Structures are given as structure tokens and as C-alpha cells.
Amino acid sequence: MRSQSRSAALLGAAKALAPAGVDFHVFDRHGELPLFNPDIEAALPEPAMALRDAVAAADAIVIVSPEYAHGISGNMKNTLDWLVGHPPFVFKPVAVFNPAADAHHADESLKEILRTMSADLMGDACVRIPVIGAGITSAADVVASPMLAAVLVSAWQAVVCHVEGIRARGEAAVRVVFDR
């Protein structure tokens, strides 16, 4: 995961543009997760426990992930594998902020994985934000772009509306974001 990637810029902009009242936390320990192995699930490694705890504490999850060779990164897949069958992830509201307008292979693959995991994909909050190829190199560049900022603000509104709807129904603040 590159700290200066365009996905990191989008993640930083998402944090900067998060609505008031949104408690926004980034899970940045992907590199510490061992390769998923169901044989070691009984003695859960600490980074995997931290991931699961973060997901359990979240009302919604926002994923920012690049496309690699027409797919999601191995790191993202490994992170998701640690959540397969984890009850707090099931029906968890999830938004996907895709940093490339034309990265449809990874975008669709990620969404299919999330649907298989029984995530509650928030359609209006799953957006492609064309950071790649737009001369964007930082979160400030995204925030300064009226078009890109508007897409993010709209996606955030969809996240908040969805979470508020869940709360109004008496079911389960937006807390966890992962991958760069």
C-alpha cells in the first residue's frame, strides 16, 4: 500500500469531506494481517482481531481500493477473507469509493465479493471518482476539484441517510475505512 497513492488521496479527501458528526476511522493495519488461514482462526492473530473489532464497532464501512491487473489487490482480498463468516460483518452497510472511472473489473469483483459476504451494499454510496488520470496527487487536489468533491459529498450523504434509516428502524456513526 503506497502512502502517496491516488487511493490514499481519495481516502484523505473522504475524511476531509465527511459530514459533521461522522466518526471516521481508518483501518491501516492490512500489511500486518497474515495470509488468511482458517486453521489459525481459533487463535486469532492480533491484527485480525483488531480488524474484526473495528468492523463490529462500525455502523458502516467505506472501502477505497485500487484496481490491479483487472482485480482487487491481494491485500484487500486477504482483509476481506478475515471477515468472511464474521457475524458483525453480515448485513453491515458498505460503500465503495473507487478511485478510477474505468476500473470496472475490480469494482464489480469487489462488489460481488461483498455481496457474497452478505454486506449491505449502499448503491448510491458506491461511486467511481476519477482521481486516476485527472492529475490528482493529494487529498487537497480532490477537495479542491468541484466535480470530485461533489461526488464524494453526495456519496457521504447516501451513507449518512442509509445509517440514519437503520437507526430509525431501531437497528444497529460511520467508523471504518480500509485499503489504499
Go through the PLM ranges and name each one.
Residues V26-E46, G135-A139:
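N-terminal beta-loop-helix "entrance" segment that forms/cooperates
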Residues M1-G21:
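N-terminal beta1-alpha1 ligand-phosphate binding loop
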Residues A43-S118:
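Helix-loop-strand module that forms the ligand-binding subsite of alpha/beta enzymes
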Residues S7-L11, A48, M76, A106-D107, ...:
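A general structural signal for well-ordered alpha-helical segments in protein cores
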Residues M1-R2, G31, A101:
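Short, glycine/serine-rich, charged loops/turns that create anion-binding
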Residues A18-H25, D120:
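A generic structural motif
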Residues M122-R180:
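Glycine-rich phosphate/pyrophosphate-binding loop and the adjoining helix
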